[in-house]
């Protein structure tokens, strides 16, 4: 018999009854029922009930066992007594009568229990992540993550993509966030950077004559903590294709993402024909560029009903042509208590309030806005929004560029409060026609709005003749249930167009050569039209595991202060190491 096991803890069935078996694993739970000990033994594969009574030669040692001790148990498989079977377990018809126990690894007192799913402070869970990972839900999430990555690889290869590994040590570049810098010992004063994405390398692969590239790529960004992103690193399904237009990328990617979602959605419906929503339309209807399409509420411009009306606050705003009034329908929200609750929520978000109209039985409007604009305008708003008695509408006004984010939050809040969001489906969509540039209010300059390597719609001619803020890019995102899960674009592969695009954003040709010299040189030697995208592995896994916390699908994540509490990173290093790197510390004063 094998030194440690003849079977795993998830393997035994009726067919093994009367066999002598050997199991090894962790003592998941130990119960004493009238002097008979029941030990639930757990390993990676499952759980088996082991029984020791006073007649067992191993009973004395069994009494000393504690939770999470690692043991080897020998015994005979037998059928559980009638009425004690556990249909929730694959091994639930069988138990092991214990004849021998060997303690392989005793455990100290546990800082958090493995049995059960009690909530514990996050810092404790991260410091003792090796215990946390033994817990059933987190353990299963990590296994699901591995299966999802396997599925991605298989489906990408079926689409004709080949897997490559691009460098981890690279050059620093202004792709968005701060780089993690790695000092060079051999070249004092110079630094490598960990890649924010394999962007330049994957484009260089297309210029090297390869046709369809992908990898599950680690990416590193020195960003301030955000609720929807783990600090430090994340993984993406990265891909690039040669001789393609936007529709070709869509045709290659949709079957992969749809297939992965359908495989792991546990029967929940998944969008088959993805809508394509222009960026501007997405802001106008949903107040976000990552809409949750499970929420049926659509915002509408109702400015005409307030222009010149008796509600002077909105009427005066509308004298400025850039201002608008948007309405968010609230079907079933036509009570004073609900409207007041929404108004209080808006004030909690830093807004002066949230105007509303309610419609009573009989169809008349109620509330301060209705009283000020009169019954005809109130009725016109009701008709435009398709509302009825018992419904409400909520209003935001001003410059849409300044209020659309809040309007989107209000739409989401209404959908949640009114129970309009179907949680049991996955709604996927393309967001297209992103603006190439945006105005940076802080720096008072035009900046790239997304990926600086995207092709402008209209090419070099658009860059030379159009107002930069009106130029659209061949840039696209995939959204699912309110999350951006992928982003990409058709690339700007002509060197003169690339230089012009960066010039508009304030970079001269010398800047381009200095920062992107390798790719710029490659553009001079025959660059094919190419495009691609990157899908966030972590977010996709998070959605498919039914959680909203990225730490619940990551092995050893950092906390929100970018600290690895298990390994003690970041840490101080020895003075000798700093001297070898020619680094002197200049720490901030407390």
UniProtKB/Swiss-Prot annotation:
Entries under InterPro entries matching the protein: Aa-tRNA-synt_II (IPR004364), aa-tRNA-synth_II (IPR006195), aa-tRNA-synth_II/BPL/LPL (IPR045864), Asp-tRNA-ligase_1 (IPR004524), Asp-tRNA-ligase_1_N (IPR047089), Asp/Asn-tRNA-synth_IIb (IPR002312), AspRS_core (IPR047090), GAD-like_sf (IPR004115)
Annotated localization: Cytoplasm
Entry binding sites for L-aspartate: 175, 221, 450, 491
Classification via Gene3D superfamilies: Bira Bifunctional Protein, Domain 2 (3.30.930.10), GAD-like domain (3.30.1360.30), Nucleic acid-binding proteins (2.40.50.140)
Region of interest (Aspartate), ranges: 199-202
Keyword ATP-binding on entry: yes
GO BP, one annotated term: aspartyl-tRNA aminoacylation
A cellular component term, taken from the record's GO annotations: cytoplasm
Important for tRNA non-discrimination (site feature) positions: 33, 83
SUPFAM superfamilies: Class II aaRS and biotin synthetases, GAD domain-like, Nucleic acid-binding proteins
Disulfides per UniProt: none
Catalytic reaction annotation: tRNA(Asx) + L-aspartate + ATP = L-aspartyl-tRNA(Asx) + AMP + diphosphate
Residues reported to bind ATP: 221-223, 484, 536-539
Main EC class the enzyme belongs to: ligase
Documented EC number(s): 6.1.1.23
GO molecular function annotations of the record: aspartate-tRNA ligase activity; aspartate-tRNA(Asn) ligase activity; ATP binding; nucleic acid binding
Primary subcellular site in the record, as a coarse category: cytoplasm
Record-stated family: Belongs to the class-II aminoacyl-tRNA synthetase family. Type 1 subfamily.
Complex formation: Homodimer.
Function, as annotated: Aspartyl-tRNA synthetase with relaxed tRNA specificity since it is able to aspartylate not only its cognate tRNA(Asp) but also tRNA(Asn). Reaction proceeds in two steps: L-aspartate is first activated by ATP to form Asp-AMP and then transferred to the acceptor end of tRNA(Asp/Asn).
Protein name in UniProt: Aspartate--tRNA(Asp/Asn) ligase
Organism: Nitrobacter winogradskyi (strain ATCC 25391 / DSM 10237 / CIP 104748 / NCIMB 11846 / Nb-255)
Gene: aspS
């Amino acid at each position: 018999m094998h030194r440690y096991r003849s079977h795993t803890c998830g393997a035994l069935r009726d067919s093994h009854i009367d066999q002598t078996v050997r199991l090894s694993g962790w003592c998941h739970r130990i119960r004493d029922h009238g002097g008979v000990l029941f030990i639930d033994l757990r390993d990676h594969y499952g759980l088996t009930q082991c029984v020791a009574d006073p007649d067992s030669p191993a009973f004395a040692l069994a009494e000393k066992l504690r939770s999470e001790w690692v043991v080897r148990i020998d015994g005979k498989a037998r059928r559980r007594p009638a009425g004690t079977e556990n249909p929730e377990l694959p091994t639930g018809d069988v138990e092991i009568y214990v004849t021998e126990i060997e303690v392989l690894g005793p455990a100290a007192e546990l800082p958090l229990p493995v049995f059960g799913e009690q909530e514990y402070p996050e810092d404790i869970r991260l410091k003792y992540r090796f215990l946390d990972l033994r817990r059933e839900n987190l353990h299963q999430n990590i296994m699901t993550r591995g299966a999802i990555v396997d599925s991605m690889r298989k489906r990408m290869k079926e689409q004709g993509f080949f897997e490559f590994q691009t460098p981890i040590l690279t050059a620093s570049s202004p792709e968005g966030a701060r780089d993690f810098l790695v000092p060079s010992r051999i070249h004092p004063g110079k630094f490598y950077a960990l890649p924010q994405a394999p962007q330049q390398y994957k484009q260089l692969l297309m210029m090297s004559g390869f046709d369809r590239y992908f990898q599950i790529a680690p990416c590193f960004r020195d960003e301030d903590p955000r609720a929807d992103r783990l600090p430090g690193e994340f993984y993406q399904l990265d891909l690039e294709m040669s001789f393609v237009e936007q529709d070709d990328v869509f045709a290659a990617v949709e079957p992969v993402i749809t297939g992965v979602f359908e495989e792991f959605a546990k029967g929940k419906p998944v969008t088959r024909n993805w809508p394509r929503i222009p960026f501007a339309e997405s802001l106008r209807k949903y107040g976000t560029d990552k809409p949750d399409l499970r929420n049926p509420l659509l915002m509408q411009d109702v400015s005409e009903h307030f222009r010149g009306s008796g509600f002077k606050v909105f009427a005066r705003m509308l004298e400025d042509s850039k201002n608008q009034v948007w309405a968010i329908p609230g079907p079933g929200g036509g009570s004073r208590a609900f409207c007041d609750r929404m108004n209080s929520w808006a004030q909690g978000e830093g807004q002066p309030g949230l105007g509303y109209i309610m419609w009573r039985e009989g169809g008349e409007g109620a509330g301060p806005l209705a009283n000020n604009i009169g019954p005809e305008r109130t009725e016109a708003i009701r008709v435009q929004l398709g509302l009825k008695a018992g419904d409400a509408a909520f209003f935001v006004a001003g410059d849409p560029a300044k209020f659309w984010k809040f309007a989107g939050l209000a739409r989401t809040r209404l959908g949640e409060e009114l129970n309009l969001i179907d949680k049991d489906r996955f709604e996927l969509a393309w967001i297209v026609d992103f603006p190439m540039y945006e105005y940076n209010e802080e720096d008072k300059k035009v900046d790239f709005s997304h990926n600086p390597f995207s092709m402008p719609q209209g090419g070099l001619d658009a860059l030379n003749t159009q107002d930069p803020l009106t130029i659209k890019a061949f840039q696209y995102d995939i959204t699912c249930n309110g999350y951006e899960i992928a982003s990409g674009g058709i690339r700007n592969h002509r060197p003169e167009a690339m230089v012009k695009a960066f010039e508009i954003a304030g970079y001269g040709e010398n800047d381009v050569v200095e920062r992107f010299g390798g790719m710029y040189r490659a553009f001079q030697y025959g660059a094919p039209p190419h495009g691609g995208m990157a899908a966030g592995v972590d977010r996709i896994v998070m959605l498919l595991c039914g959680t909203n916390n990225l730490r619940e699908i990551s092995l050893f994540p950092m906390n929100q202060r970018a600290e690895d509490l298990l390994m003690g990173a970041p840490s101080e290093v020895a003075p000798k190491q700093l001297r070898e790197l020619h680094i002197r510390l200049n720490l901030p004063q407390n």
